[in-house]
Regions:
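Short linear motifs at protein or domain termini
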Residues: 1-103, 211-222
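Juxtamembrane/interface motifs at transmembrane-helix termini
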Residues: 53-54, 104-107, 131-133, 152-155, ...
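Conserved amphipathic alpha-helical segments that form helical-bundle/coiled-coil interaction surfaces
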Residues: 107-168, 182-188, 198-209
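Short helix-capping and inter-helix turn/linker motifs at the boundaries of alpha-helical repeat units
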Residues: 12, 110-111, 177-178
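Conserved short acidic donor-positioning loop in nucleotide-sugar-dependent glycosyltransferases
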Residues: 191-194
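A ubiquitous short alpha-helical element
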Residues: 78-84, 98-106, 123-127, 147-148, ...
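Short amphipathic alpha-helical interaction/hinge segments
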Residues: 163-167, 171-174, 211-218
Length: 222
């Protein structure tokens, strides 16, 4: 009897293009307001125009790209007021999620967040900002998911997609990056202790400090 053949699944080209184009925008290789040159991006990413255009449309739904009627697309400009409003809401959402997570997160979920935290610490020690940021974003999302409220998690993901570039910019300051790592150490300690009151305060403070750094970075980039 022949063994069942498991199909080899590959990530669709437009999904790969989304990931790579998102990184270019978030990490500043493509600047806010910059027009997207399709020919250059196709060559850089090694893809045709069809998956690139699909990727651009998807990133437009995330708020990272702005579609221009009959003129292509551009990297979405950073708007300080909108960023401030979004991060203010996200601070409240993370505080609520932290409170819920302290009550009901499983041991496996806490262990997973601890593993991500330790990986993030290693990226910080190696001064790998891109790697640090990926771990950082995963930690924030895992804390929200550990709260066990899928509606909260879904809205959080949508909002976070709109501020990825700004959140990355905040840690371009070494002083802010150092402070953010210390804040995450305290957040991890409070979460593992299931100290809801302390964790909610720390998460709110962390997002407030992030907001101040974001607005400072946006002002300098203007």
């Amino acid at each position: 009897m022949q063994a069942a053949i498991t199909p080899i699944t590959r990530q669709p080209l437009h999904e790969l293009a989304v990931d790579r184009l998102r990184d270019l925008i978030v990490q500043g290789d493509l600047s806010p307001g910059e027009r997207l040159n399709e020919r250059m991006l196709c060559e850089r990413l090694g893809i045709s125009r069809t998956p690139l255009r699909e990727a651009i449309k998807l990133l437009a739904t995330e708020g990272l790209v702005r579609l221009l009627p009959h003129r292509g697309a551009q990297v979405a400009p950073l708007e300080a007021r909108r960023l401030a409003d979004t991060l203010e809401v996200m601070g409240a959402m993370e505080a609520l999620a932290g409170e819920l997570a302290c009550r009901q997160a499983s041991a496996a979920q806490l262990a997973g967040i601890r593993a991500l935290h330790d990986e993030m610490l290693a990226k910080y020690a190696a001064r790998d900002l891109a790697g640090y940021f990926r771990c950082n974003q995963a930690i924030h999302l895992k804390i929200v998911e550990a709260g066990g409220n899928p509606v909260l998690a879904g809205i959080y993901r949508q909002l976070n997609a709109n501020v990825l570039r700004a959140r990355y910019m905040a840690n371009l300051s070494q002083e802010r990056w150092d402070a953010a790592m210390r804040e995450h150490e305290a957040i991890m300690t409070a979460l593992e202790a299931r100290d809801a009151q302390r964790l909610t305060r720390l998460l709110r403070e962390h997002l407030a400090l992030k907001l101040a750094a974001v607005l400072n970075a946006v002002e300098k980039a203007a």
